[in-house]
């Protein structure tokens, strides 16, 4: 088995999918898991990007089906901007599409800035822009877990195969969640699910960005990665890609393995 095939298997990627069937499987997963845990629903941060829009709509469909079947479940969508978000219109469009039971807005700027200032005062140096970006991601997850804890809700994560293969997420930030309904999907497969669900094309054709850096606001994921999502998707779907691209992907996969594992102990062997 080639490394490419091993990665596809490890990340549960199918080269060809039926969007309608995938929607059904993922809604059923959300329903089954929330019932098993005894939780009362879900909470998810909504950025206006493809991934949170898709995960949010799946979550809302799941809780509506649970209620229609006589159960009790709710979904809270959370806007988590740092000051003013330049693509706020897209975030609002996503909320309109998702139709969450409840939506709230929580500006993380005061919390992040207070922490950054305290860090500088105590340690005598400023956080790097990259490190501060990770703080933003972790504060967002702290907020979601606070809302989830208050309301007995599970926190949904938006990780999918194209992020997982590169480790392109913040450990214990957007990478920290209770369940991942997009696991195994490539970026283009996620777009196909949103198309099937009737989303406005603005929500899945826009340039993907983590938008965590103050010094490079709105920087494209592909710029930061040095790899395009089409290249990642082709690789993950078993297609041939240029050798240098495959090497970049495989290197990122190898060095980011720790991000796809629970905290290491001396009894684990994945890191050896």
From Swiss-Prot:
An example of a GO molecular function for this protein is: NAD+ synthase (glutamine-hydrolyzing) activity
Classification via Gene3D superfamilies = HUPs
- Which Pfam families would you find in this protein's record? NAD_synthase (PF02540)
Binding annotation for deamido-NAD(+)? 138, 171, 178, 258-259
The Swiss-Prot or TrEMBL record describes its family as follows: Belongs to the NAD synthetase family.
Task: Give the protein's recorded name.
Answer: NH(3)-dependent NAD(+) synthetase
Question: What biological processes does GO assign it?
Answer: NAD biosynthetic process
Q: In which pathway does it act?
A: Cofactor biosynthesis; NAD(+) biosynthesis; NAD(+) from deamido-NAD(+) (ammonia route): step 1/1
The organism's lineage is: Bacteria, Bacillati, Bacillota, Bacilli, Bacillales
Q: Which GO terms describe its cellular component?
A: cytoplasm
Summarize subunit and interaction data from the UniProt record for this chain: Homodimer.
Provide the binding site for ATP: 45-52, 158, 187, 209
Annotated InterPro entries: NAD/GMP_synthase, NAD_synthase, NH(3)-dep_NAD(+)_synth, Rossmann-like_a/b/a_fold
Q: Supply the HAMAP family for this chain.
A: NadE_ammonia_dep
Q: Does the keyword Ligase apply?
A: yes
Q: Which UniProt keywords are present, listed alphabetically? A: ATP-binding, Ligase, Magnesium, Metal-binding, NAD, Nucleotide-binding
Q: Which reaction does it catalyse?
A: deamido-NAD(+) + NH4(+) + ATP = AMP + diphosphate + NAD(+) + H(+)
- Which top-level group of life is the source organism from? Bacteria
């Amino acid at each position: 088995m080639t490394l490419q095939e091993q990665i596809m298997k490890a990340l549960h990627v199918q080269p060809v999918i039926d969007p309608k069937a995938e929607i059904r499987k993922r809604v059923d997963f959300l329903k089954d898991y929330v019932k098993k845990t005894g939780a009362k629903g879900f909470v998810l941060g909504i950025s206006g990007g493809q991934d949170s829009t898709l995960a949010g709509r799946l979550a809302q469909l799941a809780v509506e089906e649970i209620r229609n079947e006589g159960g009790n479940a709710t979904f809270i969508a959370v806007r988590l901007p740092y000051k003013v978000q330049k693509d706020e219109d897209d975030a609002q469009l996503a909320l309109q599409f998702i139709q969450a039971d409840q939506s709230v807005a929580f500006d993380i700027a005061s919390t992040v800035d207070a922490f950054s200032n305290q860090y500088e005062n105590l340690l005598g140096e400023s956080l790097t822009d990259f490190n501060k970006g990770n703080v933003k991601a972790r504060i967002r997850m702290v907020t979601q877990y606070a809302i989830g804890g208050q309301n007995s809700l599970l926190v949904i994560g938006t990780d999918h195969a194209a992020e997982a293969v590169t480790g392109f997420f913040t450990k214990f930030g957007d990478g920290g969640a209770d369940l991942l309904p997009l696991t195994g999907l490539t970026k283009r497969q996620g777009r196909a699910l949103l198309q099937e669900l009737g989303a406005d094309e603005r929500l899945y054709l826009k340039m993907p960005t983590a938008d965590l850096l103050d010094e490079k606001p709105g920087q494209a994921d592909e710029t930061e990665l040095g790899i395009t999502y089409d290249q990642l998707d082709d690789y993950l779907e078993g297609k041939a890609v240029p050798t240098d691209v495959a090497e970049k992907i495989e290197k990122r996969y190898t060095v980011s393995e720790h991000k796809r594992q629970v905290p290491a102990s001396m009894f684990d062997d994945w890191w050896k």
